[in-house]
Amino acid sequence: MNQALKELRDRGLMSQSFGNLEEVFSTPQTFYIGFDPTADSLGVHHLIGLIAAKILQTHGHRPIILVGGATCAIGDPSGKSEERKAISMETVFHNVEKVKEQIGKIVDFSSAAPNAAILVNNYDWYKDYKFLDFIRDVGKKITVNYLMAKENVRKRLEREGSGISFQEFSYGLLQGYVFVHLYNHYGCRVQIAGQDNLGNMVTGQDLLHKMQGADDVCGITWELATCADGRKFGKTEGNTVWLDKEKTTPYEFYQFWLNQSDEDSERFIKMFTLIPLEEIAKLVEEHKANPSARVLQKELAKYMTCMVHSEEEYNKAVEASNILFGKSTTEDLANIDEPTFLAVMKGVNKVEVPKDDIMNGINVIDMAVLHNKVTSKSDARKLIKGNGFSINKSKVVDDKMTVNSEMLIDGKYLLLQKGKKEYTLVVAK
């Protein structure tokens, strides 16, 4: 089997396909993968496609990264129970610029090699394609019955009280024609995409056959990632895990991968990383010999954080993890940036105190009872006497100590700790 295709299959990145893949991939090919820039960041679920593209690029094939500036404005009805809200072209252009930077961290645009990736925006040709010309050139090649039989359209029509606008109905035709354009202008013969995009891929294949007489094109899809327990992949506590660190901090990103189950980690480390499969097999053996060491989760979290962010951000995330779960120090707390600190504290009990009170000084006993697990002043004194109470990771040994503004982290926070793992965050307002 062709080595590029074998690696995709072995990593779980190939489910269904069409065309003669072995014959086509016997020589270097140009292939494309598309992203509709509906947000100003890609999510972790997009990484599957980028890794698949990187694998093919590593084997000598040229990726076209297609951003759907035009199709994004129309809206893909796949998996949607109602029509998506319209996105302005200004927002689309902004989103394109943002995701371009993220994609460039994984696929290689800068290489002088003939298979350096290129980025194409379908808005660049659709903006000048007149409606009457498109209907005449493309619309007459595909019947309404054909489009209505597509699963994404059919499900919307079958849903009671629902329907589909002509705008969304046209999405499959616009998306299918993308393949024709890339075939004509770049010699692109292969599309890769998630399984949910198979219908649009086949439309592109059919249009190529009818418009160009092309029978030498192929498509590859992968199953959408899901967690073993049935949870939707790519979300934590109901929120999307983004690649943009302003939307999901590197610490939260690191924790997302670190908290995967054993079963999911074994699958995901193949799907989302480029770690050689032989090395992964050894990691799996090591993990099974000592599951509590969480070897797979740690390696997965390290690789993903370094790839999407940087080694520096990975090291910061590890240090931040030690705040609540390890032996960090007051100095460690002071060195962590505020967004990371707040991400670590997301689930910690919080209490607000007037900043003026802290500026004037508060007795440590009065401060200690602000902790939700410290029941009284006498309880606070016992904790301090028994070395069981800390502020900012420093043990409190004097129950007459005064807490003042010099102790504030970033000029506004105090971390109160009872015992080893019970925390309250004081926020000076």
Model-assigned labels for residue ranges:
Residues M1-N197, V202-Q205, Q212-C218, R231:
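NTP-dependent nucleotidyl-transfer catalytic core
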